[in-house]
Amino acid sequence: MAPWGKRLAGVRGVLLDISGVLYDSGAGGGTAIAGSVEAVARLKRSRLKVRFCTNESQKSRAELVGQLQRLGFDISEQEVTAPAPAACQILKEQGLRPYLLIHDGVRSEFDQIDTSNPNCVVIADAGESFSYQNMNNAFQVLMELEKPVLISLGKGRYYKETSGLMLDVGPYMKALEYACGIKAEVVGKPSPEFFKSALQAIGVEAHQAVMIGDDIVGDVGGAQRCGMRALQVRTGKFRPSDEHHPEVKADGYVDNLAEAVDLLLQHADK
């Protein structure tokens, strides 16, 4: 077993990233990562509290959960913390009417949101909808506002699908920030508020929790800044250089979720 496994002592709650940890998305619904279905089942049979924490913004929670269930995962919509519902809450509370630069797959999450006469922009992983025209439309909306508001569902650089690495929302968010001279409000990892909402959902304090993800910055770094421990899996978007990142060092590196669960069940809650 890993020599750092004792660092997991006292863990009562586990936050799990989805893409790159449970499965690799892609054509036909993607594929489960070896051992991950049983690993989730073992976690849920234990005394540990489990919450799924994702920046997925190409699918609604309902669609994502249905896809994972078809792959064999024990997961429900109520167990998932995702950025689109959190963004909708912000829009309602602040009376914001967004121009939506998002993927059609997540548009249903915004059905109750007024999008007439936009006074802000919401950007997500829009995939093929990241055309020049759509980016320029978002730019024009922001430039016409006295106090531009840009809300980004996560700020990831890239992620892994079965066909290879794919650009995420972050590069497009940065383009609008640069063009408009503004800073986006990030809803999703690595936002502290996003992690805190996931922890509140399972009633666990940050120092009692561990995040398991494939993103050294968004998952590991974001969780550690909130006071959590964090493990990086060598699946999904993991790159060998992540283990030598100049700013972020995971509490441990594991080959996959199954190995992480082995260590958790040996050392956690002790």
From Swiss-Prot:
Belongs to the HAD-like hydrolase superfamily. It comes from Homo sapiens. It comes from the Eukaryota. Keywords: Cytoplasm, Hydrolase, Magnesium, Metal-binding, Nucleus. This is Phospholysine phosphohistidine inorganic pyrophosphate phosphatase. Homodimer. Its EC number is 3.1.3.-, 3.6.1.1. One of its GO terms (molecular function) is phosphatase activity. It catalyses: diphosphate + H2O = 2 phosphate + H(+).
